[in-house]
């Protein structure tokens, strides 16, 4: 199958949700990111995401390994705007039986794309060229400090509900090389190549013990 060309990130749809300061279930959270689609893409992406809330700031640190090297990887937390518990998809999320769990197939259990992990999360812009890129060894690091109020205000404008509820969200890492051939059955957002949004790792956000 001939790989589809990478289109502008301006074509990606954006969604987001976050919560009032002081209403967090905890002040430190962690997500252990485990591989998705590893058997198909030939690499097992994994890592750890740590999120902490202090002095009105949300600090996010993500360390990853096993990524397809040399490319930028979209990273976000996903969830349900109504506060329903999100979960990482299992193999049975592959409802069309093509061997891949694509972005659209994750929505039933994981919800929609919410907060992006790039240089400016409070913009809520999913299309962005400042997501982390993997080095030659397949490792990537992300760190960001953002005012909770800035994220809340943006999310309230977009979703009419500044609900963070980190413990009800999951984190996804996306993306494989555009040289990787995918069947047409692997679905993505309108106008966005499937290799950009294919989930390659996921972890549930939990209060750190």
Task: Explain the meaning of each model-derived region.
Residues 11-13, 23-24:
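Cleavable N-terminal signal peptides
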Residues 18-20:
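N-terminal signal peptide c-region/cleavage motif recognized by signal peptidases
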Residues 24-209:
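N-terminal leader/targeting pre-sequences
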Residues 1-10:
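Bacterial N-terminal signal peptides that target proteins for export
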